[in-house]
Amino acid sequence: LSLYAVGILLSRASKMPGRDGDILARLTTLPQALADHAKKGILQAQFAQLPPVPQLARHLATLLGSFTFDWSILPESPRKTSLPLQMPLLTLHDANSEALLQQQLQTQWQTTWQQHFATAPWMMRNWLIYRVYHDVIGQTDGADYFPLVCDFYLLRTLISLWTLDGSSLRQEDIFALFAMFERWRASENALLVRQQIQSLCAADPLLSAFSLLT
């Protein structure tokens, strides 16, 4: 919901051309207006009405199998050994198996969130705050919002894959998965993957991003 609110903020800001005093004053009122909508449940209702557009999410889950992660960052565990061997298999999925995998991962994320993040939401929230502050604030066209939401979806998919076979997920594993993903983001492989992801993006980056939040 927090990422959806950021997207709404960017969408409304993009529809306010110019930077005169009146426009800037209206922009400064948007965060409080969104907070008020959240308190009243309006924002949640709008979020629940987002239509599911699973194609992009399915493609991203498959694409994750081609990422060159530095698995050595992870603390020792059986999953550290088994998951890297399973990742390349993601690239072999056809359309039908992509759809099944995406459904499994979505269900698994709900379970994983409740077990590991619901009582400690700061772990994901701190990462999101860092990314929004460094990559999104100051942008009004959604160009940097779409990569952020893609990264959120990829990171949650990676975590869901970790727990998909019933493997335990320690807090140290979570921190290491975040670190491993951030190291990948700074790699040459990430630049190539970004180009592939952009080719999957629809004309409107905000709508593409919203499709990953459903």
Segments predicted by a language model, with ranges:
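Hydrophobic, aromatic-lined core segments that form the binding pocket/scaffold
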Residues: S2-T214
